[in-house]
Design a protein with these regions (language model features):
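Charged, amphipathic alpha-helical regulatory modules used
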Residues: 1-109, 721-726
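Conserved catalytic cores of very large enzyme subunits
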Residues: 88-92, 98-502, 523, 529-692, ...
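Contiguous, well-ordered alpha-helical segments that form the cores/surfaces of helical PPI scaffolds
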Residues: 231, 300, 506-519, 541, ...
């Protein structure tokens, strides 16, 4: 049985320490109020509660239980002494708030840091440097930069102020990189002028350099479009044709144009293969200044091509990208595995969704890729054109920024044309809906009152995000603000104009709609007749109404965002259990449900789930993604295609979750299971050989839109274990 110390490290529970602490407090009293047997009884009760919690309790939680039990024994003077001791120790700890945290993460015994980010390896020096900087930033943020009530709400799990480890700096969240502008008009990387590339392979190489630079200048994800690389295929084609012509002439051969074109196309395909491979391998092997591979999404949308030739060339790039992802990348043992990045998004459209359509072959390839490697994810052009309508009444299809954060439609006042690439998100604050419900005690009037109070708190927290960016000079990140990734501002110019008028967005996240509804109505939000669904939709509308009010008030694009709780799901769950105890169906798990999702354990088929969630996705304009959990589908591609066609007709953005694991000890290639060890901790175990060494297995799971490969905290691991199949 483990407990979590204040520095995040995990240690064995020691009953004797409780006995010693209470005995000292008792001895300090003039009249000892507790007998040795009473002290032993207190310690044993704490041990019982710790076991019953079915998770590692924190030292603070254990001390709270000790206090309660001393009071229950009527030993009030002992309780006062114990509280005074805690307070004195707390003051000593606050004298330096970061030393223990930093030292524990350097020595790799900080359990919370180990499992905080499923794509960061905390044993690597570069990651540790990022975490060290993050601890300092979090400390400054808590003590100086944020109002105390926002800090307290964050620590209590009432809200989550995202990425406080980067808040000390003037950094934004995520964006759509304007790769087209940078490649066509040139850019500057690390003080070096980069001109328009003269081949597809060079364009791919430059793109990876841009990705790395952008990732090092922000804390969130980024997206690029393959359509911005497509024009360079024709440039390479013409170069290769000229080269083949020269070779023929040098040998005195007479080659007709058809032969030259055939040879050129073969060489061109080889260049496309090498270019795509450059992007894949550079992305997974690059380490940015925040200690991880860039969180990058590659967008594959035929509709972005400007002409027929460019569309055909884009199709070749998409085909090669899918083929290489199906193959995967080799791990250190030389075995092909599923890489986490880049994330791929494939747009379903009339030209590729029906059998017999011109690009149906790409959709079949995408289905095979999803069945084996969990990507691509799918955007329905049909539904997105319905959802994302600008002020002129025109619908648009575009990618999300990284995982799921979507921009709002925007017309550039300079050109009177829609603009998406070069825009960004300022940051996120997430509201814990479950806490609002539990705080209300089930009283509807009280619920809406507390809801409004919490929304006001979120508004002020979001304005802290906004104001932190306000006044930022373009010099803070030249690749972003001066050299085309997001803008081409002058040196020394402030970025303020990009923060207003809809150019960028700022996101109000939400989590736990299922548990909130369950507590307030006694029903799941999938329950149409019992009032669950109607209540859940009214909560969503209330969130949107708040954002619309703030938008008019501030001229800033506030939007609702279905938060991908990665490690925070565990934190929220622990905070809820601490504040409200174990409530069946509400706080009895070590996680809470992401955004509007159907609870992971609720039986529901794939099509019903997607149809149901589509209503809620539409009410999350700032971003959201739905998923269906499926078994190994590699031998049932027609079923995958059927789900994809359903996505096209019914929901804007969705993904299929499969399993893709490998045991390095025995070579097992299948699903590595989650089991409970002797301490009650969830661990990963090979079903073939029993291997439990995480360093000797490759596990890839969908964490929250992205694929995670570095394991997860106990809350998220339990959530993964509880997932039921939908197909």
């Amino acid at each position: 049985m483990k407990i979590i110390k204040r520095n995040g490290s995990e240690v064995d529970f020691d009953l004797n320490k409780i006995v010693v602490a209470v005995t000292k407090a008792n001895a300090a009293c003039e009249k000892q109020e507790l007998t040795a047997s009473q002290i032993q009884e207190i310690a044993e009760y704490v041990e019982f509660k710790t076991v019953k919690a079915n998770r590692a309790l924190s030292v603070e939680e254990i001390q709270d239980i000790v206090e309660d039990q001393i009071m229950a024994q009527g030993a009030f003077e002992v309780a006062r002494r114990y509280v005074r001791y805690r307070y004195t120790r707390s003051l000593i700890r606050k004298a330096n708030t970061t030393d223990n945290q930093i030292l524990s993460l350097i020595e790799c015994n900080n359990e919370e840091v180990k499992q905080e980010n499923s794509n960061k390896n905390p044993t690597v020096n570069s990651v540790q440097r990022d975490y060290m900087a993050g601890e300092v930033s979090k400390d400054i943020t808590k003590r100086i930069l944020l109002p105390q009530d926002i800090v307290e709400a964050h620590e209590a799990g009432i809200i989550h102020f995202h990425d406080s480890d980067y808040f000390a700096q003037h950094m934004h969240n995520c964006d759509l990189v304007n790769l087209e502008d940078m490649l066509q008009n040139g850019t500057v990387i690390s003080g070096t002028m980069i001109e328009k590339p003269h081949s597809f392979s060079t364009a791919c190489n430059i793109a990876t350099q841009i990705i790395a630079q952008v990732a090092s200048s922000q804390y969130g994800g980024q997206s690029i479009s393959l359509a911005h690389l497509a024009p360079f295929v024709q440039i390479s084609r013409e170069k290769i044709r000229a080269s083949v012509q020269k070779e023929a002439e040098a040998f005195g051969a007479t080659a007709d144009q058809e032969q030259i074109n055939k040879i050129a196309e073969e060489r061109l395909r080889d260049e496309i293969r090498r270019g795509v491979q450059t992007i894949q391998y550079q992305v997974v092997t690059l380490l940015t200044t925040n200690g991880q591979a860039p969180f990058v999404t590659v967008f594959m949308y035929l509709g972005e091509a400007k002409n027929a030739q460019e569309k055909a060339d884009l199709a070749m790039i998409i085909e090669e990208t899918l083929r290489q992802r199906i193959q995967g990348v080799k791990n250190e043992k030389g075995v092909w595995i599923t890489p986490a990045f880049p994330k791929l998004i494939y747009v379903l459209e009339e030209d590729n969704i029906h059998e017999g359509a011109p690009y149906w072959y790409l959709t079949e390839l995408a289905a095979k890729c999803t069945a084996k490697r969990m990507v691509p994810d799918y955007i329905s052009e049909k539904k997105m054109l319905e959802y994302k309508v600008d002020k002129n009444g025109e619908g648009h299809c575009y990618t999300c920024m990284g995982c799921r954060s979507f921009l709002t439609p925007y017309i550039d006042p300079k050109t009177n044309k829609p603009k998406y690439y070069g825009r960004f998100n300022q940051g996120v604050v997430t509201l814990n809906l479950v806490d609002i419900a539990c705080s209300s005690g089930g009283d509807m009037d009280k619920f809406w009152k507390i809801f409004d109070e919490r929304l006001e708190l979120c508004y002020r927290a979001l304005m802290c995000r906004h104001n932190r960016l306000k006044g930022t000079l373009s010099d803070a990140a030249p690749i972003l603000w001066q050299y085309g990734a997001l803008a081409r501002l002058e040196k020394g110019e402030k970025i303020d104009k990009l923060l207003y008028g809809g150019y960028s967005t700022i996101s109000l996240g939400y989590a736990g709609l299922y548990e909130c509804t369950r507590y307030m109505t006694g029903k799941s939000h999938t329950d149409d007749e019992g009032g669950g669904k109607a209540f859940a939709l009214s909560v969503m509308q209330h969130l949107n109404d708040a954002c619309n009010k703030w938008k008019k008030q501030e001229n800033i694009d506030f939007s609702i965002y279905g938060t991908p709780l990665e490690s925070t799901t565990y934190k929220f769950a622990k905070c809820l259990q601490k504040r409200f105890g174990i409530i069946k169906g509400v706080t009895d798990k070590n996680y809470i449900t992401n955004s509007y999702h159907v609870h992971v354990s609720e039986p529901i088929d794939a099509f019903t789930k997607l149809k149901f969630e589509s209503e809620f996705q539409r009410l999350s304009p700032g971003g959201a993604i739905s998923y269906v959990e499926v078994p190994n589908m590699q031998q049932n591609i027609p079923a995958v295609l059927q789900v994809m066609q359903y996505i096209y007709d019914n929901i804007m953005y969705a993904e299929l979750n499969t399993k893709s694991d490998y045991c390095q000890c025995c070579g097992f290639d299948g699903e590595i299971k989650i089991v409970e060890n002797a301490d009650g901790k969830l661990i990963w175990q090979c079903p073939n050989c029993g291997n439990t060494d995480q360093d000797k297995m490759n596990v890839a799971r969908r964490t929250c839109g992205y694929i995670g490969t570095q394991y997860w905290n106990q809350g998220r691991t339990q959530e993964i274990k509880d997932r039921v199949l939908h197909l």
